[in-house]
């Protein structure tokens, strides 16, 4: 993740062939969108898959979010992330937001991701709601470990998805052996 205004992206983000990462997430607030677009274009030109994580959308005016989404839609970003930075959104808000993001993303050949925080213990519910609305990349961490109240718990998400390509048992084993006292 590269936060707008917090890194020297032209120097810090190496060309893809010299790096161990494949994706750059540009984290931004709506008022920083022009700088975010510059970072997106720079990372894309260096060979990365690039997403735009528009943060703090629960504190953002709808018109400002619409303008930011329009800017990302016109950029070379591969994806747009719904980011509930403060864990303040309810499932019905995620539903509307996911529909808006998905409509814009599909019209512009992009995917949508979800990054939820757990301040109201809704990160899991909101991630599931986003998935039900067509969001394809779902962020989760072991035991929900993350900033503040944490994120969506990976072990819950993997169990819920019931997809045979996902095996929750190695995650549970890691948690038991390395995270629990």
Q: Which role does the model predict for each range below?
A:
Residues 1-181:
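Catalytic cores and adjacent flexible loops of soluble metabolic enzymes
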């Amino acid at each position: 993740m590269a936060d707008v205004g917090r890194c020297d992206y032209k120097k810090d983000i190496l060309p893809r062939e010299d790096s161990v990462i494949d994706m750059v997430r540009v984290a931004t607030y709506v008022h920083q969108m022009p700088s975010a677009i510059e970072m997106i274009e720079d990372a894309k030109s260096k060979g990365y898959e690039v997403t735009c994580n528009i943060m703090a959308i629960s504190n953002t005016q709808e018109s400002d979010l619409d303008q930011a989404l329009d800017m990302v839609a016109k950029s070379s970003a591969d994806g747009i992330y719904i980011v509930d930075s403060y864990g303040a959104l309810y499932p019905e808000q995620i539903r509307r937001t996911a529909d808006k993001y998905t409509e814009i993303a599909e019209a512009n050949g992009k995917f949508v991701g979800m990054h939820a925080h757990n301040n109201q213990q809704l990160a899991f519910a909101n991630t599931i709601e986003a998935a039900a609305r067509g969001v394809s990349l779902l962020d989760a961490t072991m035991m929900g470990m993350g900033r503040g109240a944490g994120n969506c718990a990976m072990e819950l998400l993997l169990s819920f998805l019931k997809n045979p390509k996902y095996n929750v048992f190695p995650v549970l084993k890691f948690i038991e052996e390395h995270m629990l006292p």
